[in-house]
Amino acid sequence: MKNNNSKKSAQIGNISSNKTTVSNSSNLARIQKIVSSHGKLSLDDQIAYMKHKGITFNHITEDAAKDYLSQNTYYYKVTAFRKNIAKINGKYTSLDFGLLSDLATIDMYLRYALIKINLDIEHTLKALLVSVITKSNAEDGYTIVKEYDMCCKNKLLEEKPKFKEKNYIPVDKKIMSRNKKIDGYHYDLYTKRKNNPPIWVLIELMSFGELIRFVEFYYDNNKYNKNLFTPAFILLKYTKNLRDSAAHSRPVLLDIVLQKQIQPTQNATEFAKNAGVEKLERHALVSNKKIHDFICMLILHDKYIKSDAMKSDRKIELTNIIERCTKRSHYYKDQADLIRVYRVLSKILANYHQKC
């Protein structure tokens, strides 16, 4: 009788286990269907899908992860950093959610620092442009606007042969018209200078992309003291994507481990060499777009910012971020690629503003 009861209990247990397996498989199939159609996942679905992909919750519990995803960030942002981790047969073998959340925090600090660095560069270059144009006896502040506009127009027509010239909007009109709304911060400047604005007004209102193009125009056209802008002419364009990612709160550490993405500039390669980055690591990681662009940003900041105090402030902030990377170093013990990036970035930062 006891043997019969034991057999029945085992059978019931097997049936229950089979039902659970079927239920889990059905739930996973449902989640995968949502993912493939780029649909919305609930918090429970997000956790289940991460577990399916091999992401563990050893450093942060599943409940804590749900709180983090609902209060601090969102799924697609924090999981973007998983792309820095290798997969085996489509699944992660050494990735914990704690590492993802830690990278997201480090990324936040880095974005804030990069914005400050870029604002320093942008302001200094605008001030330098106004200064050299003011000092030049060949410039009246208005002729250069016409020259720049003609340059932009010719370049547009060259790049887009089918573009109708009658649809072209002059540079000064384009820049000034962005500020014509009465509730805008620069409306007063617009009303006073909207017709025939001088170059110093346009420089003040230029976007970062427009500033890059104007620096290139100034250099290419052999303007007064153009050699002052040689580093900016070569490197400024490389900082734009990094600056935009930081300004719009997009992850900057995404794909930071990828190698040989670009052919790096000689300036960035030399900077890394002087920082003590070994040849193999230079070849592998200075060719990463974001590491390369970060180096370009540091070179420009060191070149154009004259205040040692400002440079020291930025270096201290970046050094604190590098030190923050080691706060949970045990999360990264199996992440050789990320450790390598950390080592390279530490050397690069140490080479910036060595007076500090």
Model features per residue range: what roles?
Residues 249:
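Acidic/aromatic/glycine-rich contiguous surface patches that form carbohydrate-binding/processing clefts
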